[in-house]
């Protein structure tokens, strides 16, 4: 759960920012690729195919990168793993990302075994120098440390394991929580870097989860949450946050998903857009 003791930086964003309390991640056979694409385009994907790969060669003039690029922002995107499964190095530029950096371009060590995932702290360390000195930047980062598996030993699954000894959770849950500590540290480093560069008050940070931790059983997840994930597909409820240090906190309880993120951000930044071309809603509007 999101608490100040274990995850002070995530808690800060969630408790001091705009938090979406009934946000859900669509479930399909390509959760990460499709839901990332949905966030970037505000379009629904095809649930039985990896839409982001099948249509990677299309151009997307209304995608988030192009919209902010047209508004005068420098655009770039980053991921701390390889492109074995998702073709970000193709589709991101076609959406308007001027530069896409994967783990190899960032000189982050990674494994091809899909077991040892890199540290998101390294993602922040290596990515921020590429954009932090720009006057106006729009950046998309895809983190990876918290990914499954949780049932086997791993570097970051075990790194903070002892810190959760007081909790009566399964080892798999504790490994997930250990990995979350690394993500929390990465967010803390990002906040620190922005503040040191005098950019924090003028930066909006949006965070969403592409899917629930399906490497855990529903039974395991129920030991942590205060609601039953087996009821009404509550297991698919995931956090979504928009944070700016100078913006008052707000809890939004209407039902949302990442498809609503782009229209909301375009409204926040007063970017001219045609809402007929987006399937999501501006969450600050009445609907």
Where are these regions (language model features)?
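Solvent-exposed soluble domains appended to multi-pass membrane proteins
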Residues: 1-287
């Amino acid at each position: 759960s999101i608490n100040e003791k274990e995850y002070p930086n995530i808690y800060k964003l969630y408790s001091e920012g705009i938090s979406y309390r009934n946000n859900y991640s669509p479930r399909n056979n390509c959760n990460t690729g499709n839901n990332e694409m949905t966030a970037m385009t505000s379009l629904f994907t095809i649930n039985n195919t990896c839409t982001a790969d099948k249509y990677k060669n299309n151009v997307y003039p209304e995608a988030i990168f192009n919209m902010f690029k047209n508004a005068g922002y420098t655009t770039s995107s980053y991921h701390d793993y390889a492109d074995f499964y998702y073709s970000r190095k193709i589709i991101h530029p076609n959406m308007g990302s001027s530069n896409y950096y994967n783990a190899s371009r960032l000189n982050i060590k990674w494994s091809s075994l899909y077991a040892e995932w890199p540290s998101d702290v390294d993602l922040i360390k290596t990515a921020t120098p590429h954009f932090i000195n720009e006057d106006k930047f729009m950046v998309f980062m895809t983190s990876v440390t918290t990914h499954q598996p949780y049932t086997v030993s791993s570097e970051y699954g075990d790194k903070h394991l002892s810190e959760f000894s007081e909790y009566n959770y399964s080892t798999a849950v504790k490994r997930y929580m250990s990995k979350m500590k690394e993500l929390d540290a990465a967010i803390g480093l990002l906040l620190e870097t922005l503040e040191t560069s005098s950019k924090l008050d003028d930066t909006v940070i949006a965070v969403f989860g592409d899917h629930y931790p399906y490497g855990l059983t529903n039974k395991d997840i129920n030991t942590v949450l205060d609601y039953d994930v087996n009821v009404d597909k509550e297991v698919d409820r995931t956090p979504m946050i928009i944070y700016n240090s100078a913006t008052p906190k707000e809890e939004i309880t209407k039902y949302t998903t990442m498809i609503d993120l782009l229209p909301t951000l375009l409204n926040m930044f007063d970017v001219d857009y045609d809402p007929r071309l987006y399937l999501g809603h501006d969450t600050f509007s009445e609907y």
